[in-house]
Every structure is written in C-alpha cells, then in structure tokens.
Amino acid sequence: MTQPSTPDQKTPPATKEGTKEGTNKLWQQVRENLQIVIIALILAFLLRTFVAEPRYIPSDSMIPTLQVGDRLVVDKLSYLFHAPNRGDVVVFNPPDVSELSDIGKDNAFIKRVIGLPGQQVRVQQGQVYINNQPLKENYLAEPIRYELPSFVVPEGQVFVLGDNRNYSNDSHVWGFLPKVNIIGRAFWRFFPFDRLGSIT
C-alpha cells in the first residue's frame, strides 16, 4: 500500500543553477544547428558558383536533343582545365548584341559547339562543313534552310548553333561566341525522369 507523502519526501523545487544549466544547453544546441546550416549554405554556394549548377530549358532551340522544360546539370569546372570540344552542349552568357531585341543579356543561352578556333566553317545546301569536310550531325531536327559563306573562327572564340537550326538564335545570327562567356557544359538531364541521362 502506498504511503502518503510527507513534506520531506517531496521533490525539491528547481534551483537557479539547474535552470541556468538547461538554458545554456539549449543555446549551445541552437548555435550548433546554426553552424551546420551556415556551413551547408556556404558549401551549396561554392558548389553552384564553381562546380555545377542546375538549369532549366525555356525554349525550343535545341529540339530534339533538349525539350522545353528539361532540367539539366551544368559542369562549370571542366573548362578550367581544357577548352570546349566540338559537339559540346554549352551554357553561356550571350555576347554584346544589344541591337537584337529578342536577346536578353541577363538570360543564359544553350547551344552546341560547332566550330573551334582556327577552323574553317561554312554552311552550304543544308550541310555544315568544317575544314571542307561535311559534319555528321544525326541530332538535327530538320535540314538547314540557310547558307553561310566560308569563314575562319578567330582565336579565343567558338561558333555555336542550336540543334533546331532554323529556329535558333545563335552564331549564324549574331556571330562568334567568346570563350570567356561560357558558363559550363550541360552534361546530365535530371528531369523529366523518363528522359534521365547524359547529354550528347
């Protein structure tokens, strides 16, 4: 049978020292959590700035390779060690072509590298030629309906075209792309899931 409690059996009230110790532990936990959040944010910023970042495709200029709404990962690190290769799909800031009203300098573009520095390029009868050799392009939406006379790509620049050639605002409209404008190479599509995979 339970004995009735007596005054000397009651739990003593919390002391000021006990309350202070509990408060200190709480603030220590809050500080640790804040440090974790801050470190995570810094790492995310560094990764996005220097390593890789996600991108969204808003236009049809790269159809059929990329569809409107595709979400990609852009590799921002590789071009620090080597130059772009022909065939790379690159994300870049458009050059200073402000006379073209449909180009927004704050919006990044995505196109395919076709001509490299020192290479001779021309478009004739629906075919791209590099150094007088026809370029095999099995990724095109349809045959090219414009022509370009022969030219040589200058040093420090590349010639880029969209895969949807006849509906792409690219080098055939505004000229060469300075390499320094390139943000990175689009290499992986992570959405939609049924089209998940590398970009070639």
What kind of feature is each model-predicted range?
Residues N166-V173:
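Active-site loop architecture of trypsin-fold serine endopeptidases
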Residues M1-A108, K179-T200:
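Protein maturation boundaries and topogenic segments
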Residues G162:
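Phosphate/adenylate-binding glycine loop and adjacent helical scaffold
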Residues I57, A108-I110, V123, V153, ...:
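A broad, structural micro-motif
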Residues A108-P134:
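Mid-length scaffold segments of soluble, non-membrane domains
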Residues A141-G156:
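Acidic loop->beta-strand submotif enriched in PP2C/PPM serine/threonine phosphatases
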